Structure formats: structure tokens, C-alpha cells
A protein has these predicted regions:
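Catalytic cores of nucleic-acid endonucleases
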Residues: 43-91
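A generic beta-sheet turn/junction motif
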Residues: 21-23, 32-34, 89-90
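Conserved catalytic cores of phosphodiester-cleaving nucleases, focusing on short active-site segments
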Residues: 26-47, 62
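Short, low-complexity, polybasic intrinsically disordered segments
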Residues: 88-102
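Acidic-basic catalytic patches of nuclease active cores, encompassing PD-(D/E)XK
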Residues: 1-17
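Residues forming the ATP-binding cleft of Hanks-type serine/threonine protein kinase domains
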Residues: 19, 42, 100-101
């Protein structure tokens, strides 16, 4: 996956892909120096169209899935985490929004 390769070139370590639980699915979980990045990947004709596809309900599911991930991995709930969104447009260009829901 292009997005995974992009993050790994930047020094991130892939922890999980398509991690599933009853709360939802996380596309990618990546470890960076001081945080876990939970990543949602969206593809559409344009980057803005891809971002528009993420609503409040999906954000809640991502957050709940992230909490379930921390519990499953026995990580403390005060672990430094962030939520990134990667969008791919129709020609395969990647845009990353770090801390997208802050």
C-alpha cells in the first residue's frame, strides 16, 4: 500500500493493518517516536471528496476502535495517540492530515 510505504520511509513502524474489533476497523496503526498513529485511508476522485466521506459517526467508531486496540495490546489508556487521515485522489497522489480530528 502506498500510504504504508510513505509512513515507513518517514521512520514509522507498522504495528497493524486493517485491525478489526466489534467497535470498527482501523486501516493502519503505526508507531512513531512518541505516539501511536491510528490512520484512516480514503480514496476518491479528489482529496476533498475523500475527506468529506468521514463523518462524526465514523470518527466515533475510529476512537472506540483505538481504545479497543490499546486494551487488546495491554497499553495504558493515557498512551500518546493521534488520528491521521490519508487521502488518495484519482491519480494516486497521497495527502496526509496529521491529527485530523484535533
Amino acid at each position: 500500500m502506498q500510504v504504508t510505504a510513505h509512513y515507513m520511509r518517514c521512520g514509522y513502524i507498522l504495528e497493524a493493518e486493517r485491525w478489526r474489533c466489534p467497535s470498527g476497523e482501523i486501516d493502519l496503526v503505526l508507531q512513531c517516536k512518541n505516539a501511536l498513529a491510528f490512520l484512516e485511508v480514503k480514496q476518491s476522485k479528489t482529496h476533498s471528496m475523500a475527506l468529506e466521506r468521514i463523518g462524526a459517526r465514523q470518527i466515533d467508531r475510529l476512537y472506540n476502535a483505538a481504545m479497543a486496540y490499546l486494551a487488546a495490546k495491554q497499553l495504558p489508556f493515557d498512551t500518546n495517540i493521534r488520528f491521521d487521515v490519508a487521502t488518495l485522489d484519482s491519480i494516486g497522489t497521497i495527502e496526509i492530515v496529521e491529527n485530523a480530528f484535533a
